[in-house]
A protein has these predicted regions:
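Auxiliary, metal-adjacent structural segments of Zn-dependent hydrolase domains
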Residues: 1-39, 88-95
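Helix-loop segments that flank and shape redox-cofactor active sites
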Residues: 35-42, 76-78
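Short pre-active-site segment immediately N-terminal to the catalytic Zn-binding motif
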Residues: 3, 38-53
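Post-HEXXH active-site segment of zinc metalloproteases
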Residues: 63-96, 114-123
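Substrate-binding/catalytic groove segments of enzymes
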Residues: 105-117
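Pan-zinc metallopeptidase signature
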Residues: 117, 121-178
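Active-site recognition of the HExxH zinc-binding catalytic motif
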Residues: 52-65
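An active-site-proximal "capping" alpha-helix that borders the catalytic cofactor pocket
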Residues: 92-107
Length: 178
C-alpha cells in the first residue's frame, strides 16, 4: 500500500460531505486570503490550495459559536503582517484554541504541524513564540484528555476515514475523543 499526501480537493470534499452538509457550510479553496462569509450556505474560504490553510480555517469555524458564525469572518479583527507587540500578543491569545484543533486535524491526515505566528516581522528567537507554542501544546493536551468539541470531532473523524480511504499517513487515528 502506498501513501499519498492529501490534496486540497480531497479536504474540500471531506468537509463538504461530512460536517459541511450537516451544518449548511461549504469549504472553498482558491482565495487570495482566508475568509468566512455567512449566508446560505455559509462559506469558509481558504488560501489558494494550501491544505494547512483549509485545516486552519475549519478549526476557526469549529471554535466560533453560533452567534459568531452569523458575522463576516466571525466578527474578528485582523491586523496584517507587521503587527506591533500588543497586536501580536492579542493574536496569540485568540489563536491557541484554533491552532490546537488544527494540530489534531493535521495529525488525522499525517501532515506536520507547526504553530503559525502569521507575522514576518516577528523574530524567530522571540521568547513569545515559545510561550505561544507551549500554550498550543497545553490546549492540545487538554483535547487529547477531554476530547474535541462536537463539530471538530465530527470533522476529525471524517478526516480519519479519508485517511484510511486514500492511505494518508494518519498519526492520530485513535488517540483523541475516540
Amino acid at each position: 500500500m502506498t501513501t499519498t499526501d492529501p490534496t486540497a480537493g480531497q479536504m474540500i470534499h471531506c468537509f463538504n460531505q461530512s460536517i459541511g452538509v450537516r451544518e449548511g457550510t461549504v469549504l472553498k479553496g482558491g482565495a487570495s486570503e482566508p475568509y468566512y462569509k455567512p449566508g446560505s450556505p455559509d462559506t469558509i474560504y481558504f488560501r489558494e490550495d494550501f491544505i494547512r490553510s483549509a485545516l486552519h480555517e475549519v478549526a476557526h469555524w469549529c471554535v466560533a459559536g453560533s452567534a459568531r458564525r452569523t458575522l463576516p469572518d466571525y466578527g474578528y479583527w485582523y491586523a496584517p503582517d507587521g503587527r506591533d507587540d500588543s497586536q501580536q500578543t492579542a493574536f496569540y491569545a485568540v489563536e491557541v484554541k484554533p491552532q490546537a484543533l488544527e494540530k489534531a486535524f493535521c495529525q488525522a491526515v499525517g501532515i506536520e504541524f507547526n504553530v503559525s505566528v502569521d507575522n514576518l516581522s516577528v523574530s524567530l528567537s522571540d521568547p513569545a513564540i515559545a510561550l505561544f507554542e507551549a500554550a498550543v501544546e497545553d490546549r492540545f493536551g487538554s483535547l487529547v484528555l477531554n476530547g474535541l468539541p462536537k463539530r471538530a470531532e465530527i470533522f476529525r473523524h471524517a478526516l480519519i476515514e479519508y485517511s484510511r480511504l486514500y492511505h494518508w499517513p494518519s498519526t492520530f487515528a485513535s488517540d483523541v475523543g475516540s
